[in-house]
């Protein structure tokens, strides 16, 4: 039985976003006051992310027959992440050089308000690769869960899963408890998701109310250029990868449309993480693969953020008439290959990584960040949407490469067919 249109989350979130835009535009002060609604929803999601990752990864790893399979999955995932995110960086670099959205602005860096970006520049000092790697190791297990640090929780979950697997039958009781706890957690997620329309409404009303449509027009060339690039990346690059893997990118986007709308409303791909874990498993990817690829992808496979970083950096150079020859752009690319891996899928993190990159390159004026500070919030939607689609595609690709993908289930689900339980099973 199909769900009524008015009861579907897709329709409710879309309607809430539209109402939020109207409120923010016609009553900006009231719209700006709706911010707590969006913040509250995102906090509710973050509250549940750590236990979701822990349960999914532990039960996935502990339930595998061979530990070699886990290592193979991790290696394949990291290889895929590196290749595709590098392609995203290069595409962003090429298109921003061709379209030149910042050309002709002739901005003097000394006239920009450096104080406006001082807080981001300060946070960027801690974005070194060594500091990033050390931060993956939690000071305490409780601290990792309390702070909601995805990679720290993931590391502990992987170790816990390995240890539980080695216990064999002795660990069966613990395995059953965690699996039951996982069902409770996903029950909580279903309750939280009923509030998604309210969260999307509040976040969108605040964005339009605070920054206004005028901000979009002021620096619209960069925004348009960025959105076009993200669309091209999803359709051409991810579309080609999907086709080579055996599925249609547009059918996949339709399958995760509710998650995309939640991300559109909150501007954070992290807000859809719990539901993506569940949906990718229902799509035919084995639980162990989903549990490793999705959480890891939130730091190592942010395609939208990669595009944003190269385009924003070169845009600042163009707008301030800072010459960037091929050597400077290659240096920028190399630095971004490292710094982009620390950009978690939360609102604002991409801007901090951009500040870190500009500081590391040294050739660009740090005050130039003030140029895009006001419109960064509007570009975060495209970043987050591209990140989410990219991680979903990555999960299917990795699952196929390690022969942990149910092809029939994938095909049936994307084509809205009810899978035949008698014929379900892994196929290579």
Curated annotation (Swiss-Prot):
Keywords: Cell inner membrane, Cell membrane, Membrane, Symport, Transmembrane, Transmembrane helix, Transport
Transmembrane regions: 8-28, 44-64, 76-96, 142-162, 184-204, 222-242, 326-346, 352-372
Similarity comment: Belongs to the dicarboxylate/amino acid:cation symporter (DAACS) (TC 2.A.23) family.
One Gene Ontology molecular-function label: succinate transmembrane transporter activity
Listed name of the protein: C4-dicarboxylate transport protein
PANTHER family documented for this protein: AEROBIC C4-DICARBOXYLATE TRANSPORT PROTEIN, PROTON/GLUTAMATE-ASPARTATE SYMPORTER
The species this protein was found in: Enterobacter sp. (strain 638)
Bilayer disposition of the protein: Multi-pass membrane protein
Cellular component per GO, a single term: plasma membrane
One Gene Ontology biological process: L-aspartate transmembrane transport
Cellular location(s): Cell inner membrane
Entry function: Responsible for the transport of dicarboxylates such as succinate, fumarate, and malate from the periplasm across the membrane.
InterPro entries in the record: C4_dicarb_transport, Na-dicarboxylate_symporter, Na-dicarboxylate_symporter_CS, Na:dicarbo_symporter_sf
Gene responsible for this protein: dctA
